[in-house]
UniProtKB/Swiss-Prot annotation:
Keyword ATP-binding recorded: no
Top-level taxon of origin: Eukaryota
IQ domain span: 32-61
Topology relative to the membrane: Peripheral membrane protein
UniProt key word Phosphoprotein: yes
Reported function: This protein is associated with nerve growth. It is a major component of the motile 'growth cones' that form the tips of elongating axons. Plays a role in axonal and dendritic filopodia induction.
Record field: compositional bias (Basic and acidic residues): 9-33, 74-86, 191-213
Stretches of the chain forming a coiled coil according to its record: none
Disulfide bond sites: none
Lipidation (S-palmitoyl cysteine): 3-4
Region Disordered, annotated ranges: 1-213
Family of the protein in this entry: Belongs to the neuromodulin family.
Entry protein name: Neuromodulin
Species of provenance: Carassius auratus
Amino acid sequence: MLCCIRRTKPVEKNEEADQEIKQDGTKPEENAHKAATKIQASFRGHITRKKMKDEDKDGENDTAPDESAETEEKEERVSPSEEKPVEVSTETAEESKPAEQPNSPAAEAPPTAATDSAPSDTPTKEEAQEQLQDAEEPKETENTAAADDITTQKEEEKEEEEEEEEEEEEAKRADVPDDTPAATESQETDQTDKKEALDDSKPAEEAGKDQNV
């Protein structure tokens, strides 16, 4: 009995599943297929994205070697131009060596040029000194002129003071009665008159005395 029951139950389940399928109209297999297709599509998209990123990285890496190659080419182009001045400098040094030999006339020429340049420097110094002297002379003359003006002013002031003192003394003398010659003459005449009067009076007195006798 138990075996029969166990066998009958799954059959009932299948029937129920069939009924559900009939109602929905879709089978679980179809749902699983759809889910699988979605998963595959998403996986493919992920793979394609990775490929795109890898391609971008590869492109950048490709451009970087190209740039490095261009820079190397530029350096190679520049390096010969840099080497040329070095060669030119060595050539000029080699050319200058014979000129520096003691027996060559080129070696004797620079001292003469130096001697010529030395006198040209000395006149310039002398001219500068002369200019300084010329500039100092007007200053000295101005200073002397200023000193002379000061001395003359002082002398004039002294003279004015002396004149003022003399005028003051004269004014004082004018205020005080001076012993003029007229006054002295009048005094002398008065004295002479008095003497004459005395002389005249003496003979008269003598005559009176004689009469009395």
